[in-house]
Curated annotation (Swiss-Prot):
PANTHER family reported in the protein's UniProt record: GRPE PROTEIN, GRPE PROTEIN HOMOLOG, MITOCHONDRIAL
Gene: grpE
Main location: cytoplasm
Family note: Belongs to the GrpE family.
Protein name: Protein GrpE
């Protein structure tokens, strides 16, 4: 029996190195795991730095675009006003203008100006007599006794203007007071 035990021990000792060798061949050592982890960390840091640089470049380009937009926002409107200025200068160069030709020139210039306003979404606020006072668009300059409903427009002193839907200048109005 001793011989059998001895053979079993020898067989076990022979199997152990083979099994241990096979296990070590498939399982990475701690040093290999550390090296792989360090490589992964380096790759992730590189990816992070590239993403950070890309975001910073995007932010910088967006800021430059906003700055450019602010700088040249009025360019289109200014181009529309140049013919108006040209018309006024030509009117001043006429040596002996007649009242009729001056009136015609002013009307044409006003049409050019209105076209520029319309194209750039600059809208007039001209309340009519009897319109309800709108504090978002009208500024009451005075209250006057009138034969109409209280808090309604009696007279428009000066037109107001909107750019798109934003108030540029309120219309100045006189308002009917309560009786």
């Amino acid at each position: 029996m001793q011989d059998q035990d001895k053979y079993a021990e020898q067989a076990a000792s022979i199997e152990d190195p083979v099994t241990a060798e096979a296990a070590s061949a498939t399982t990475p050592t701690l040093e290999e795991q550390l090296a792989a982890s360090q490589l992964l960390v380096q790759e992730l840091q590189d990816s992070f730095l590239r993403a950070k640089a890309e975001v910073e470049n995007f932010r910088r380009r967006a800021q430059e675009d906003v700055t450019r937009a602010h700088k040249f926002a009025i360019e289109g409107f200014a181009e529309m006003l140049l013919p108006v200025k040209d018309s006024l200068e030509m009117a001043l160069q006429v040596e002996t203008p007649s009242v009729e030709s001056l009136k015609e020139g002013v009307e044409m210039t006003l049409k050019q100006l209105n076209a520029a306003f319309e194209k750039n979404r600059l809208l007039e606020i001209k309340p009519q007599q009897g319109d309800k006072l709108d504090p978002m668009k009208h500024q009451a300059m005075s209250l006057v006794p009138a034969d109409q409903e209280p808090n309604t427009v009696v007279n428009t002193l000066q037109k107001g203007y909107l750019i798109a839907d934003r108030l540029l200048r309120p219309a100045l109005v006189t308002v009917a007071q309560e009786k």
